[in-house]
């Protein structure tokens, strides 16, 4: 069966004019008759590209301030007509076939993101005719070609040039999928926006904004299929959120190494998000989504060396993240010292790349620099539902903490407390972190009782010969009993940072005073499950 369809007439109507002139010129060069609307038609005419206004083609003017332009039988009949079936109906109604439609939609997302956007502004940027044409063309992909993204202009022209002015069914079907994805995302954004409008009274349109819509719509695009999931019997794929513009594992470029696994991606995300918390040279080593070593240094090499010393055993087969360009010295130290699954950094020097290339299986990622963090949502799937929350971007500075003990922390201890608190945010609850001089010396993660996390952190430090005496400790949540304080004191901890908020806070503070320890409250918890 012949699956190519010639393009003799095209309708172009775009809000984003990127590349449209070149596309229209190429279509004209192929002998395609061009129809267009409003601003797009004017742009083409101003550049001497022959074009017919849709209103002239239909014999009906745009009405209602442009709200009704393309909603006409001559447009949708021309798009939806089945070639070889509907010709008689088309002739009876003076309808000509439209073989290609190029549409991108009113900028709804950009409009509602602007400060001071009103509901009226949002409403006027809800496209009606555009999505209708997109869906009509995509539905009739057997005969018509839909283009919703400027990146596909060149592809369509190249195929027409290779097929005597025609497109193939394979291409039309692929473009139809992209079109339905496009309209689904567009409608989802509109539904989310309106869904956050909470009526103050039953007869009101809207008054109050809710953070979370009545129904939640989000679209993720598949980046790659994965060999398997968390375990080898599970199928998996990696999807990315194209609305997020931030340095991340999702946007990172893989420079070398084996394909990333499901667990690689999850662990790399944990490592990268943790290292983003620090300004000076820093290194984070993660194993099973928990930091097993975090450190600051005068340079990356020192930061890596100190992070590795926290727990060399757990660092084996781990993920290493840096917050500055990976240099040759640090790369050589990693290659000489340990087996590593993934290394990620904002940038990797050519010299470092050459060194790591000797370990062909090591996955080396470059994620780009980061300046700000995007305000996004976190999702957690439960059986039959989805938990959604704000991303945990809670920050605590020195001026935010409250000293609750008799003993005052020193300036150096306060620096270590801030460092330790940042690390604890990325450790699975119950989380306890011991640190000294900008270096973790023990991490207790994921225990069902807080006291055992405290004990494990001490055991880890002792196993590596790290001195706990006069170190500081961070706890991601309050201490329900004094036993965690007693365990920390026995290990040699001299200062503690924790949220506070327990009904036994007075008893906890008294325990710290009894041991001669300094203690500060943050008033903020960092549970991580």
Swiss-Prot record:
Keywords: Hydrolase, Multifunctional enzyme, Purine biosynthesis, Transferase. Pathway: Purine metabolism; IMP biosynthesis via de novo pathway; 5-formamido-1-(5-phospho-D-ribosyl)imidazole-4-carboxamide from 5-amino-1-(5-phospho-D-ribosyl)imidazole-4-carboxamide (10-formyl THF route): step 1/1; Purine metabolism; IMP biosynthesis via de novo pathway; IMP from 5-formamido-1-(5-phospho-D-ribosyl)imidazole-4-carboxamide: step 1/1. Residues 1-148 form the MGS-like domain. InterPro entries: AICAR_Tfase_dup_dom_sf (IPR024051), Cytidine_deaminase-like (IPR016193), MGS-like_dom (IPR011607), MGS-like_dom_sf (IPR036914), PurH-like (IPR002695). It catalyses: (6R)-10-formyltetrahydrofolate + 5-amino-1-(5-phospho-beta-D-ribosyl)imidazole-4-carboxamide = 5-formamido-1-(5-phospho-D-ribosyl)imidazole-4-carboxamide + (6S)-5,6,7,8-tetrahydrofolate; IMP + H2O = 5-formamido-1-(5-phospho-D-ribosyl)imidazole-4-carboxamide. Disulfide bonds: none annotated. The keyword Transferase applies. PROSITE patterns: MGS. It holds the Pfam family AICARFT_IMPCHas. It comes from the Bacteria. GO terms for cellular component: cytosol. GO terms for biological process: 'de novo' IMP biosynthetic process. GO terms for molecular function: IMP cyclohydrolase activity; phosphoribosylaminoimidazolecarboxamide formyltransferase activity. Its EC number is 2.1.2.3, 3.5.4.10. Belongs to the PurH family. The IMP cyclohydrolase activity resides in the N-terminal region. This is Bifunctional purine biosynthesis protein PurH. It comes from Shewanella frigidimarina (strain NCIMB 400). The gene is purH.
